[in-house]
């Protein structure tokens, strides 16, 4: 993963050449760069990334381009505050982090449509672009949504599902504790109640709605991109995050799914356990079951985290190689490392990439270079399939219902632990 907007243009060509020398043949760009294309509402400029892609095309590097909707610009959220996300009490998540928008504000859907259309038209025929990533980590950070736009859309979702309030009241058992609804406007996504205990059937439908909203938003991108892109250019996004039916997302809004693999998440806080850095194998097994192929869009390559949360120790010598081969052994046809060089500013100032702040070669770069040489001998493995002897049925309704069910919920933990260990 590479961020040309973080670095002086004089570094670009040398960075690309060093990556290619290390066996890195594809980079992902632009997922957080909306302002570089639309710094003022309705005024589109492409010169920055045009210059970067011109440099890329001096080399053999390939590019995965992104739609930059994970971080809407300040001008947008200031002028249209209804696009902002909210917590369960209605407190707004303001500009300054990421994933602070909601999927259902009509104005955000329109602004998304416009920026994706502009980018797809402008970059559709760039020969270095082999694929596109939609947004970035849909439902990461926030997997439940409580903005006003979400509640309005939730009522539409329920009307389409149940047709009448009588049928909804019957399905939800609202006669219990006098919860009966007599008007659609009385229904909200789960709000705080005594002991934070809401109607369990409303709760499950809300999680289904969150998934539906995510899939619909992803499909908005996908349909626009597919309209403009050459047939050999793929469209993907990452998983696995809360409250998304990834089998439907894959079938309706992606060519294939990718995964962000950070095996050391939280290891410092959780204490010693020889299996902890390999718990990601369970997720790799899950994503393997979503479609016929998958890739790793972000493979951990260094220590770190955000400046105020998420701790990851430095990978031991050989550990990046272990994780890379673990992904390949689980069926990954593509592995990309996060990130090329550690950023010197911002929230992820401690989230190390392959290179440290000093930009000097190090043991992590050498390890990845060695992996690249080994991969040349293993290239025939890409795309290969095999006949699995065992399958595990994964049911999204059961998974989501178990999140708040004090009786059956704990079985999720024990079942997963048993399968993994």
Regions found by a protein language model. Give the residues of each.
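Short, solvent-exposed turn/loop segments enriched in Gly/Ser/Thr/Pro and often Arg
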Residues: 3-5, 30-33, 66-75, 130-139, ...
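Aromatic-lined substrate-binding rim segments of carbohydrate-active enzymes
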Residues: 12-93, 116-120, 221-229
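The substrate-binding groove and active-site-proximal loops of carbohydrate-active enzymes
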Residues: 1-9, 30-49, 94-113, 138-143, ...
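Short, well-ordered coil/turn segments that N-cap beta-strands
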Residues: 23-25, 57-63, 125-130, 229-234, ...
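Polysaccharide-binding and catalytic clefts of secreted carbohydrate-active enzymes
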Residues: 89-256, 260-273, 277-282
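Short, acidic/polar
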Residues: 5-21, 112-118, 239-250, 315-326, ...
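Carbohydrate-binding surfaces of carbohydrate-active enzymes
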Residues: 187, 219, 231-232, 241, ...
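Conserved, mostly hydrophobic/aromatic
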Residues: 19, 27, 56, 119, ...
């Amino acid at each position: 993963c590479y961020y040309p907007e973080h670095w002086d243009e004089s570094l670009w060509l040398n960075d690309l050449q060093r990556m290619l020398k290390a066996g890195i043949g594809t980079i992902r760009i632009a997922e957080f760069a909306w302002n570089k294309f639309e710094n003022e509402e309705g005024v589109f400029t492409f010169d920055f990334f045009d210059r970067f892609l011109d440099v890329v095309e001096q080399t053999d590097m390939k590019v995965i381009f992104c739609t930059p909707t994970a971080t809407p610009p300040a001008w947008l959220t200031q002028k249209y505050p209804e696009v902002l996300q909210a917590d369960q009490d209605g407190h707004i998540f303001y500009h300054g982090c990421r994933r602070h928008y909601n999927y259902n504000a009509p104005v955000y859907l329109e602004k998304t449509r416009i920026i994706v259309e502009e980018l797809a038209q402008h970059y559709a025929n760039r020969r270095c672009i082999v694929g596109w990533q939609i947004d970035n980590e849909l439902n990461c950070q926030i997997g439940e949504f409580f903005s006003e736009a979400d509640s309005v859309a939730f009522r539409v979702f329920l009307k389409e599902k149940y047709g009448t309030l009588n049928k909804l009241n019957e399905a939800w058992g609202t006669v219990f504790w006098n919860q009966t609804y007599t008007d659609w406007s009385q229904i909200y996504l789960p709000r705080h109640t005594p002991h934070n205990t809401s109607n369990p059937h409303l709760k499950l439908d809300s999680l289904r709605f969150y998934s539906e909203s995510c899939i619909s938003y992803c499909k908005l991108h996908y349909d626009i991109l597919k309209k403009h892109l050459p047939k050999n250019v793929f469209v993907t996004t990452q998983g696995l995050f809360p409250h998304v039916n990834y089998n439907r997302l894959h079938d309706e809004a992606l060519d294939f799914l990718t995964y962000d693999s950070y095996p050391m998440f939280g290891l410092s806080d959780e204490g010693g356990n020889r299996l902890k850095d390999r718990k990601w194998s369970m997720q790799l097994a899950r994503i393997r079951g979503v479609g016929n192929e998958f890739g790793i869009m972000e493979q951990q390559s260094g220590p770190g985290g955000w400046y105020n949360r998420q701790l990851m120790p430095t990978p031991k010598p050989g550990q990046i190689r272990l994780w890379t081969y673990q992904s390949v052994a689980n069926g990954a046809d593509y592995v990309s490392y996060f990130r090329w060089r550690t950023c010197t500013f911002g929230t992820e100032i401690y989230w190390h990439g392959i290179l440290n702040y000093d930009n000097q070669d190090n043991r992590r770069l050498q390890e990845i270079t060695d992996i690249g040489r080994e991969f040349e001998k293993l290239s025939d493995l890409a795309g290969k399939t095999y006949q699995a002897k065992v399958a595990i049925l994964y049911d999204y309704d059961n998974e989501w219902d178990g999140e708040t069910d004090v009786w059956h919920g704990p079985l999720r933990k024990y079942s997963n632990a048993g399968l993994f260990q």
